[in-house]
């Protein structure tokens, strides 16, 4: 009799368990360039703000100086819209500057005009990856770090293989093998890292609708697919999950986008305003 009752109610029990698991699952928050909406992007103040806000992951971009130092910057050149350089600066290209020359630039002197809430913090310098990794003891957050590679401009970055070697050296130095995700639109650095250190998690960044999520991860060796938020549908997310992939869209800053991504059951969200996203997710539970 007991067995009959168990079999009779098994479908309902499975459904209830699935609902409970879905309710308990947490969508992780990645602070895009730290917290670009409110602080100078890719800066120590932005990362410190994001840590205080309670992010799960610090997201950032990397460039390489003339003397082969990894620094945190989205662009291969210094952007005069919010970075002020010395009067005698000979170049704006990071790869053509030594670290000492790069540190003369002030990237907090002017707020980014694209983000009205962003606070200017004069004296903010471009941090090295070493300096950002030194924040690791401040919490249990991970790092999602992007190799900025420009195939049409090979002179502004090292080779993909050299880039991966430099990144791995910093990961090893800080013993962060379990806390770092390497992401890129250029899969050459992902494949290079897979060959050097298969234990490092890899994320395939996707920007175009014609890119197949699952095939892109097969091609790059990634277990994380990171599409533009506009490419996300529940069906694509479900297919990625069925293939064993984690889905981490970028860059979502509006409540309407967050609602859509939650409904699509993504695993994490990359946002310029991580504090607002965290508050939204807490309120919507």
What are these regions (language model features)?
Residues 7-8, 240:
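Alpha-helical interaction segments
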